Amino acid sequence: MGFCRTFIHKKLMIFSVRKLSYIIYIVITSFFIVKNQFIDIGDETYVNQVRSDEYTKNLAMNLTQNCANDKTCEVQAMLDFVTAIPYKINESVARSSKQVVTQNFGDCDDKSNLLISLLKAKGYEAYFVLVPEHIFVIVSLPTKLNTNALYVNDKRFYILESTAKGSKIGFPLRYKMDEIKAIIDPFSNKKLVINKLEYK
């Protein structure tokens, strides 16, 4: 019986150490996840909910499966899906991709987080653009389209408006250049350094 008690005691100690290690891992991981969701923009703080999970990757693959690697087709297919989700103001912070899809509603934060997560899953260079009381997505495409684009440091990006149902790539810029508060990479949680900004 002495051996049995000692063995059980050792097992409990191993279990406790493993459990403690797991809790520490969760706390540290959660800290970095939360830290990477917040970014300060002047006097304001923006919270993102971008995702690079299997759900988002599979959704992006399904939405673009008929595009035969046509980049314009892929981006438009993902944009069509997001804009078809009903617009409804979300009083809390932005929700995850899966929540927006399953609950079937979202505001500009929610829908932009979903859209940029889908674009990221397919390997596109895309950013958030923060303007007064709104956020939209810009994406880089290899093909020059017959529409205006936002040139960031001389690189061409097309505006994607997630809240306008049926909108197309290259949505018109409806803000003055000095109203653009920041252009953000939400996956690295960094603001782009902008030396030159043009819309043409």
State where each predicted segment sits.
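A structural boundary/capping signal
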Residues: 1-200
